[in-house]
């Protein structure tokens, strides 16, 4: 064989080996990247798996143990709920009864929030409303709607059917005072876009839209209005916030599902398991530790009404009047 052909063949072989090595290195780096939680932009693990404190998905104790686990934490490491279908927990008629006046002519969000949109969105979060026994699952749905109804309420003290029948009257903040844009290299604000409160949880600020969009697979930085124009995305954004821990805050889900165990510091701050801690997670800096507060009472009123519809006990520690606020976490929801 002529020497030049041999050299050419050897060179091709070297190139092939180098290419295969680079491909292997790329696959290795991708497989070693963190999968969930704050290490992955707030992403949730698939199939209801636990997200460990280091950003990995699994269903054994190292992944699911508290404290540490960031989201979808289940004692003993059993993945919660097989499908995430909540139709067996909340019926269409219960949804309509809870949000009795959401389609009232006076409500700007009339016609927007639907039962089917909620059920569809919930399927993307297998642990939501499917963790624990039936009573616990119903309490979680009641707590979620209790908090989000306060965020979107159109009720007043003498409203027909009472103030707690008017949740989900709004789908976005009215007359926002700012663009809610904080300079960020990671989550830069898109030209002409505003990041005021939208959806059931009134998602606010560009970094929250960025984190949420990355987790649910939608570009919300460039399209924040989707949270107010697409009901499924609106519910997904709210449930994402609910399911995502904000260290040192636990997730709302972990609290209501009985997975969160308060530390000594939490106990000293008056933060004990119950609905009140969820209020602290969502808006504690403005509402908690101030004694009696009408906003906190409003959140409780919605929750108690919904628990009554589901026939479950709301439990204790419902308020955060005497709780110290958590230090600011990564996310902020309420306005």
From Swiss-Prot:
<dbReference type="GO" id="GO:0005773">
    <property type="term" value="C:vacuole"/>
</dbReference>
<dbReference type="GO" id="GO:0016998">
    <property type="term" value="P:cell wall macromolecule catabolic process"/>
</dbReference>
<feature type="disulfide bond">
    <location>
        <begin position="45"/>
        <end position="57"/>
    </location>
</feature>
<keyword id="KW-0147">Chitin-binding</keyword>
<keyword id="KW-0929">Antimicrobial</keyword>
<dbReference type="GO" id="GO:0031640">
    <property type="term" value="P:killing of cells of another organism"/>
</dbReference>
<dbReference type="GO" id="GO:0009626">
    <property type="term" value="P:plant-type hypersensitive response"/>
</dbReference>
<dbReference type="InterPro" id="IPR018371">
    <property type="entry name" value="Chitin-binding_1_CS"/>
</dbReference>
<protein>
    <recommendedName>
        <fullName>Basic endochitinase B</fullName>
        <ecNumber>3.2.1.14</ecNumber>
    </recommendedName>
</protein>
<keyword id="KW-0326">Glycosidase</keyword>
<feature type="disulfide bond">
    <location>
        <begin position="36"/>
        <end position="51"/>
    </location>
</feature>
<keyword id="KW-0119">Carbohydrate metabolism</keyword>
<feature type="active site" description="Proton donor">
    <location>
        <position position="151"/>
    </location>
</feature>
<keyword id="KW-0378">Hydrolase</keyword>
<feature type="signal peptide">
    <location>
        <begin position="1"/>
        <end position="33"/>
    </location>
</feature>
<dbReference type="GO" id="GO:0008843">
    <property type="term" value="F:endochitinase activity"/>
</dbReference>
<dbReference type="GO" id="GO:0006032">
    <property type="term" value="P:chitin catabolic process"/>
</dbReference>
<feature type="short sequence motif" description="Vacuolar targeting signal">
    <location>
        <begin position="329"/>
        <end position="335"/>
    </location>
</feature>
<dbReference type="Pfam" id="PF00182">
    <property type="entry name" value="Glyco_hydro_19"/>
</dbReference>
<keyword id="KW-0926">Vacuole</keyword>
<keyword id="KW-0146">Chitin degradation</keyword>
<feature type="propeptide" description="Removed in mature form">
    <location>
        <begin position="329"/>
        <end position="335"/>
    </location>
</feature>
<dbReference type="InterPro" id="IPR000726">
    <property type="entry name" value="Glyco_hydro_19_cat"/>
</dbReference>
<feature type="disulfide bond">
    <location>
        <begin position="50"/>
        <end position="64"/>
    </location>
</feature>
<dbReference type="InterPro" id="IPR001002">
    <property type="entry name" value="Chitin-bd_1"/>
</dbReference>
<dbReference type="GO" id="GO:0008061">
    <property type="term" value="F:chitin binding"/>
</dbReference>
<dbReference type="Pfam" id="PF00187">
    <property type="entry name" value="Chitin_bind_1"/>
</dbReference>
<dbReference type="GO" id="GO:0000325">
    <property type="term" value="C:plant-type vacuole"/>
</dbReference>
<keyword id="KW-0611">Plant defense</keyword>
<keyword id="KW-0732">Signal</keyword>
<feature type="disulfide bond">
    <location>
        <begin position="69"/>
        <end position="73"/>
    </location>
</feature>
<comment type="function">
    <text>Defense against chitin-containing fungal pathogens. Seems particularly implicated in resistance to jasmonate-inducing pathogens such as A.brassicicola. In vitro antifungal activity against T.reesei, but not against A.solani, F.oxysporum, S.sclerotiorum, G.graminis and P.megasperma.</text>
</comment>
<comment type="similarity">
    <text>Belongs to the glycosyl hydrolase 19 family. Chitinase class I subfamily.</text>
</comment>
<keyword id="KW-0295">Fungicide</keyword>
<dbReference type="GO" id="GO:0050832">
    <property type="term" value="P:defense response to fungus"/>
</dbReference>
<dbReference type="GO" id="GO:0099503">
    <property type="term" value="C:secretory vesicle"/>
</dbReference>
<dbReference type="InterPro" id="IPR016283">
    <property type="entry name" value="Glyco_hydro_19"/>
</dbReference>
<feature type="domain" description="Chitin-binding type-1">
    <location>
        <begin position="34"/>
        <end position="75"/>
    </location>
</feature>
<feature type="disulfide bond">
    <location>
        <begin position="107"/>
        <end position="169"/>
    </location>
</feature>
<keyword id="KW-0624">Polysaccharide degradation</keyword>
<feature type="disulfide bond">
    <location>
        <begin position="288"/>
        <end position="320"/>
    </location>
</feature>
<keyword id="KW-0381">Hypersensitive response</keyword>
């Amino acid at each position: 064989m002529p020497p030049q052909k041999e050299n050419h063949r050897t060179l091709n072989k070297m190139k092939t080996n180098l290419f295969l090595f680079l491909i292997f290195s790329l696959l290795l780096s991708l497989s070693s990247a963190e999968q969930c939680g704050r290490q992955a932009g707030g992403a949730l693990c698939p199939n209801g798996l636990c997200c460990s404190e280091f950003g990995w998905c699994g269903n054994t104790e190292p992944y699911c143990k508290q404290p540490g686990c960031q989201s979808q934490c289940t004692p003993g490491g059993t993945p919660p709920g097989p499908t995430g279908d909540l139709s067996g927990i909340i019926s269409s008629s219960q949804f309509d009864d809870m949000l009795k006046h959401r389609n009232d002519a006076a409500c700007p969000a009339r016609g927007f929030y639907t039962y089917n949109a909620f059920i569809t969105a919930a399927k993307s979060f297998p642990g939501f409303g499917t963790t624990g026994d039936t009573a616990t699952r119903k309490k979680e749905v009641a707590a979620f709607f209790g908090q989000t109804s306060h965020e979107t309420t159109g009720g007043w003290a003498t409203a027909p059917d009472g103030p707690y029948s008017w949740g989900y009257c709004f789908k976005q903040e009215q007359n926002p005072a700012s663009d809610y844009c904080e300079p960020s290299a990671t989550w830069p604000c898109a030209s002409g876009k505003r990041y005021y409160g939208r959806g059931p949880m009134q998602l606010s600020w560009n970094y929250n839209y960025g984190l949420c969009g990355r987790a649910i697979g939608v570009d919300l930085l460039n399209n924040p209005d989707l949270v107010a124009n697409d009901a499924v995305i609106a519910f997904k954004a709210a449930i994402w916030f609910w399911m995502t821990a904000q260290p040192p805050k636990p997730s709302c889900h972990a609290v209501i599902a009985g997975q969160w165990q308060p530390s000594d510091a939490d106990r000293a701050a008056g933060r004990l398991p119950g609905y009140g801690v969820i209020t602290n997670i969502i808006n504690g800096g403005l509402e908690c530790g101030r004694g009696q507060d009408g906003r906190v009472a409003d959140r409780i009123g919605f929750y108690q009404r919904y628990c009554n519809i589901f026939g479950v006990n709301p439990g204790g520690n419902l308020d955060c009047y005497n709780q110290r606020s958590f230090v600011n976490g990564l996310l902020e929801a309420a306005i």
